[in-house]
Amino acid sequence: MFDPKLKEALGRVQKPGRYTGGEPGSIYKEKDKVDVRFAFCFPDTYEVGMSFLGEKILYELLNSHENWWCERAFMPWLDMKAEMERLQLPLYTMESKDPLTAFDAVGFTLQYELSYTNILAMLDLAGIPFYSKDRDDRWPLIVAGGPCACNAEPIADFFDVIQLGEGENQLPAICAEIEKAKKEGISKKQLLLNIAKIPGVYIPAFYDVTYHEDGRVKAITPNEPGIPARITKAIIKDLNQFAPPTNFVVPMVGAIQDRASIEVLRGCVRGCRFCQAGFLYRPMRQRDASLLNKAAQDLCANTGYEELSLSSLSTSDHGQLEELLDDLNEWAPKEHVSLSLPSLRVDNFSQSLIEKTTKVRKSGLTFAAEAGTQRLRNVINKNVTWDEIEKTCTIAFNAGYTSVKLYFMMGLPTETMEDIEGIAETAQKVVDLYYKNTNHAKGRGVQVTISCACFVSKPHTPFQFVPMDTAETLQAKQKHLLESVHSRKIKVNYHDSTTSFLEGVFAKGDRRLAPVIVEAYKRGCYFDGWEECFKYDTWMQTFADLGIDPAFYCQRPIALDEVTPWSHMDYGITHEYLVREYNKALAAQTTPPCNRACNACGANHLLGGPCFDYSQNLV
């Protein structure tokens, strides 16, 4: 039975299915028979959170322990948030409907910098104090992990525990320490000291930060005995030890990505200098084709999904991809399951690949060119040429495709207006290629979509040292791009430059931003990643009122020897390598994929040996 307050709220909101739970695949346990209760919180709407593969992996993993129960919670949309505040209904989990305060640990995934105010909103709805220092032993442990943990300093003061790296070993180890602490009755301080011994775990309270007079970080030092000066990320050396989930919670309300999804590999060999994920998840590791095929078949059978996505940063780099597709095509067409590869690369796309992914249904193809000129592609180490783009599009058009989306970035280091014009010229050349191709789909026109993101300088990349373009400069470049497109066959989409600016501030920010985030939330800022909710002027006024210049964080160059807010976080990539790649970028020199030759980035030390067997061609 629903709580009467919840029942009343559900009758007054759109999409009440976001909040009811009871979805197929949900896991239920008896509360009095579990030792650890963990609430996995996604700081965005149900539809966004239910698309996140990481939650599905950890949900199944934690619940595989009989005496632990992992449940889910999401950020309620505006109408439900207002109803919960009006009715004084605390934020609850989907499974038990218990408030977050009933849990031993509340974990947030940090996928996007503009979700930070949503984290505060969820804590606020739960009645949990924002700052770790204000929570004693009576409160749940507040935990975070995910890609933004690589520099979580702007929100570090809110969390008791932050996980760096991959959570398959970390999170169960944390839960084991919580279980032990409950049985032994130890204090929160001692629990945190115990958790700090787990590889890849960062306890912000155990580090002090000092600053130079000009605002730059001076030093980050441990304040407890035995705490490491640098925290090295956790890594799964062999992905085959962790089979992909074979059952998902199937959402009541359509998720943004409502399909079966299998992670085929982790990491990337390419070394695109702007791509944070490519550096955070090094080195690349892949699962065996036989394991993936069985997991995929079981997952589709258990969930009823009719679309299967082979997910990764660069799926076409899997060394057994053709073999895997052959195995999948033995059963997928019979079950009316279509296959999708969301991360195809122009330089290893083939006729064979396209044939094996269109057995059931064709959809548009998406490729990342990233820059409009070869010079700028060399700067960012996007080793793609026009000849490869032409070859790929020809294969696609011969196969009957009439829709191509091209991803680009704007505001890249050394970019000029000539590079912006190159984006439009590349799209026009693709349009022309379609109509010159006598094998294109008869009676149908082509649609080429330019999707243009704003470059954001991110930690742990060679471009962490460079400033971002101002919002005004980005807007001028967007205007120039629109003026450079002269065909109705080309559609242009681009990101809002002001949200990208705020993303850049938090990406490279420090602990002095925490009060700004709290104050902005109190002034009505949340769902900052949603265009209709973003309050840029409120953010800028909040920065001004608190005496902080946001441009200091993202629109000034960082000296190559500067201590950064993330200097104490070790993701396996050496500082020397990042500097070397930065200098090569300025000289427009490229670096080959690391499976062809080791580029000495340092990630091999995480594995205790070479990342690849260089005696054989893996790609």
Q: For each of these PLM feature ranges, what is it?
A:
Residues M75-P222, P459-D510, V518-E532:
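Glycine-rich beta-alpha loop elements in corrinoid/cobalamin-binding modules
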Residues F40-C41, A105, L114, D298-K405, ...:
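Conserved SAM/AdoMet-binding glycine-rich loop
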Residues M1-I27, F38-F40, H486-V619:
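Radical SAM enzyme core and accessory elements
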Residues K7-A39, Y46-E47, P204, T210, ...:
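N-terminal [4Fe-4S]-dependent radical SAM core
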Residues F52, G254-S290, A597-L618:
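Canonical Radical SAM [4Fe-4S] cluster-binding loop centered on the CxxxCxxC motif
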Residues E55, L87, L123, D157-I162, ...:
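Short secondary-structure boundary/capping segments
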Residues L78-D79, P154, D208-H212, G319, ...:
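Flexible glycine/acidic-rich beta-alpha junction loops that bind and position SAM and/or redox cofactors
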Residues F38-D44, L62, F248-Q276, C300, ...:
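N-terminal pre-triad scaffold of radical SAM enzymes
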